Design a protein with these regions (language model features):
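Hot-dog-fold acyl-thioester-processing enzymes
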Residues: 1-83, 146-157
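Conserved interaction-surface patches within small, structured recognition/assembly domains
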Residues: 85-87
Length: 157
C-alpha cells in the first residue's frame, strides 16, 4: 500500500476506503467496553426503544471511521490528530451494515511550529451500503512532509 505524505495532497483530493462489515458481535463487544447502553447491548431491549433495534454506538462508528481513514491514506509516520471541529451522526449503524469512508482534503498548510510537517484539514463522510450518511467529521491532523522523511533516513556505514 502506498504511503502518503503532506506533499502528495492538494485541496479537493478525495480518497475512498474499502468497505467494512459491522457485525452484531463487534457492536455488542464495543458497547460492553465503552458505551453500555441498552440499545447497543441487547437486541430485544433495543426493539423497545426509539431505534426499534440494535444500533452501534456513535463512538464505535467514529472508531471504524478512524480505522478506515488510516488504512486508506496510510500516512508515513502516521497522522497526528490535532482535533475534531465537528462530529455528527445523522443516521445509525446496524448489525450487518457495510461501512465506507470518503475523505476530502479541505485545507493544507505547512506547520509553523514543526518543520517537516504539514497540517491537513479533512472532511470524512461515512456511509452504509445504501449510501446513507451515518457520520460526518471535520478534523485536523499533522502529517509528515517528504523532506522530513528524507532527513530522518540513516545510512549503514
Amino acid at each position: 500500500m502506498k504511503e502518503h505524505y503532506f506533499d502528495d495532497l492538494k485541496v479537493g483530493d478525495r480518497f475512498k476506503s474499502e468497505p467494512l462489515n459491522v457485525t452484531e458481535k463487534q457492536l455488542i463487544e464495543f458497547a460492553h467496553k465503552f458505551d453500555p447502553q441498552m440499545f447497543h447491548l441487547s437486541r430485544k431491549r433495543a426493539e423497545r426503544t426509539i431505534f426499534k433495534g440494535l444500533i452501534a454506538s456513535g463512538w464505535h462508528t467514529a472508531a471504524i471511521t478512524m480505522r478506515l481513514f488510516v488504512q486508506t491514506l496510510n500516512f508515513a509516520e502516521g497522522a497526528i490528530g490535532l482535533g475534531v471541529d465537528e462530529l455528527r451522526w445523522p443516521d445509525v449503524v446496524r448489525p450487518g451494515d457495510v461501512i465506507t469512508v470518503e475523505t476530502e482534503i479541505v485545507d493544507l498548510r505547512p506547520s509553523r511550529s514543526r518543520p517537516g510537517y504539514g497540517i491537513i484539514r479533512l472532511c470524512n463522510v461515512t456511509t452504509n451500503q445504501r449510501g446513507e450518511i451515518v457520520q460526518t467529521m471535520l478534523a485536523s491532523a499533522m502529517v509528515p512532509m517528504r523532506a522530513k522523511a528524507r532527513d530522518n533516513k540513516t545510512t549503514d556505514n
